[in-house]
Amino acid sequence: MAAADDVWCRETVPRVMELVSPRLPQRDACALLAVSPWCYRVLVANPKLWEVLDLREMKNPGDRLISALSLVRYRHLKVLNLEFAQDIEDRHFIHLKEMSGISLEDLEFLNLNACQKISDKGIEAVTSLCPNLRGLSIYWIVGLSDSSIGHITKNCKQILDLNLSGCKNISDKGMRLIANNYQGLKKLNITRCVKLTDDGFQEVLRKCSSLESLNLYALSSFTDKVYKEIGSLANLTFLDLCGSQNLTDDGLACISRCGGLTYLNLTWCICVTDVGVVAIAQGCRSLELLSLFGIVGVTDACLEALSKSCSHSLTTLDVNGCIGIKRRSRDDLIKLFPLLSCFKVHS
């Protein structure tokens, strides 16, 4: 029996832990290290387990990060999540940069969302460590400036996904740096980057022609100069224009040239009428989600156009606040849009 128990502890349990651990949250997988010396050895030797480091919302994230990156098992880290790690500071990244043997060359995605104590200096330090980064999210770090964009474009040449949402001090200068360095950019989120103007963002649209996802939520200063340029993005599938108060039917007609669009948010685009939505219906026949929330200038005519062109793709339609569109029964809606699973209409 003793021999059987020994085999169970040394071989069976560690093997089971190795099979189970990839399906667990990383924090739980780390806890398994303490089960036994045999589990520790088996799990540490599995490189797939240590490609992600998740310090989201953790206390003392800076010290934890430095300690983790000092371990051999994190040498090939691919994903680092520091979202809402509010105590992370510039000094932690600067310390990592100065440490010998620390490299993040395999890192592909870095999430610094809402790390408010990070400044341009911190961005310079951390991006210098990860030259092969492909995705960077710095959502709502309001103190960052165009200098951060300069550091990012200098240090990370392969960025495909960039989230600058809430970075209110980024200006047209930053947009020009993005345009000149990331022609292959796939995803860009500039929600609430309120200093941007048509001139700077048009350069991005002209040079980053591979864009597939574009989030312009709460940018009310852009005009049809920008929206007409969006129509040249042949690969665009996701477009959020919520609050684009200067978007007109002419601009929307140009956007309708993006035939691959599956997601289009036109919430509070108050200048839009049936004319623009009909153009979208005719040009974007793969739409799965469309929000017309709060647009009083649309009527049942646009629903009829959508039912003719998008009836076999549209699953979500929001016409809440569209007083020109009459209420319909569930059965009537299904006749128009057989795949519809979510329909929001005004009371």
What are these regions (language model features)?
Residues S286-L290, G297, A301-S347:
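C-terminal interaction modules of eukaryotic adaptor/scaffold proteins
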